[in-house]
């Protein structure tokens, strides 16, 4: 199935099947477009909502957007990256907002209706999609090693895009 057809299936059918709640396909498209514009960032639900509202004729609530995002998570379309915290008792102020990502960058490309020439002519956007591709692959490798991938950003803006941590379990 081509990614454009997959995108249509998500918007028209799959999102409502996630939890049996009927959802508006046009609203889903606008949400997925906004999410694609914010991938790789720690955009809050109100930020995404404000982005959607520029093209929305009716008011949406934070709860509605959260419900749509939850459904997209359930059907494995999006997977946010949690923040890494070095130590629970650390005095260092760490930003703990999740970073927004599609599980596959091609879904974001389809949501924005982009093609190869669009990406070649906008290298900043291309870079965000490449980052999403790296996140996807790192998650696959981390999972095989029983690890997880995180992002890190402190109060001064120092950041590490990807941080791998292997889970270690102590046995008696």
Q: Which sequence ranges carry the predicted segments?
A:
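Short catalytic-loop micro-motif centered on adjacent basic/acidic residues
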Residues: 172
């Amino acid at each position: 199935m081509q990614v454009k057809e997959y995108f249509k299936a998500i918007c028209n059918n799959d999102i409502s099947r996630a939890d049996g709640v009927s959802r508006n396909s046009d609203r889903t498209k606008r949400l997925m477009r906004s999410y694609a514009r914010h991938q790789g960032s720690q955009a809050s639900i109100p930020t995404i909502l404000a982005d959607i509202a520029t093209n929305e004729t009716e008011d949406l609530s934070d709860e509605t957007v959260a419900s749509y995002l939850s459904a997209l998570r359930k059907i494995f379309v999006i997977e946010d990256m949690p923040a890494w915290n070095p130590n629970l008792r650390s005095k260092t102020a760490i930003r703990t907002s999740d970073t927004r990502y599609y599980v596959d960058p091609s879904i974001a490309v389809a949501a924005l209706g982009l093609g190869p020439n669009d990406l070649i002519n906008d290298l900043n956007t291309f870079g965000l999609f490449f980052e999403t591709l790296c996140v996807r692959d790192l998650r696959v490798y981390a999972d095989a090693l029983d690890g997880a991938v995180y992002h890190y950003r402190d109060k001064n803006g120092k950041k590490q895009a990807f941080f791998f941590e292997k889970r270690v379990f102590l046995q008696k």
